[in-house]
Amino acid sequence: MKKITLSMVVLLGLMACSSSNDETVAVARDGQPANEVVEYVWHSKGANYSEESFALVVDKWNDLIDAQGYQMNGANILTPLVEVEGYDFIWVMLWPSMDARNAAWDHWMTNVDSEWQDAIEGVMSFDLNNVFAFEPTVMRNASVPNQTDAFENEFNFCDFNESFGFNDLKMFQAEFADFLDETEARDGPDGYWYVMMDPLFEGTAEAPLNDYLWLSLWTDVEEKMTGYENYALSGLAAKADKFSTCRRVSFSGKAIR
């Protein structure tokens, strides 16, 4: 099984269909705490890529996963909102444990990968050097579950400013929770939720890990824009900028399993 040792900074630097039943899509979408591992695999489009050909390989992949009986909670596709260098989209897999992840990958590479490579030839490709796994901690669940297979996703790659640290982050999160409660009391519940992501791979001297990764998710673009408008009026942005420096990377997401 491939060892995950790639750096978060590499991930940051290069960043700028068909679905199954509603129950499994919900697991892929709403980030249940049972997802102990979230894995991101970079993909590039091939010469024969189209929405139709991609939908066919998604169906093929789901059939292969079902046939092998892997312990997997769901899967998503993330498409960057701006053109980036290094990949065209990211295939995300949600696992109940690292043991389940490793067992599935080991079996897949030995027994299934050849068939999969034939199925995706000309449509898309991936490099196993660009696989990144994280342990998620859900900090706030959505008040209104997303009933669609689409969502908006934003990573915040952050480093603490000098003389600041995790205690400052915790204090900010407490204020942020109060802000979300007040906003929902005024405007009604919404689909926003967020997750702290701990990398399950090592950084290097040339490419160290960020201090923390904050992942925000919304039901749609309108909800995201409304959330940002409220946030801008709250004064929290200035507080966040005081203790850390972050880079945002945004995607549109679609649950495929």
Regions found by a protein language model. Name each.
Residues 6-10:
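Sec-dependent N-terminal signal peptides
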Residues 14-18:
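C-terminal motif of bacterial Sec signal peptides marking the signal peptidase cleavage site
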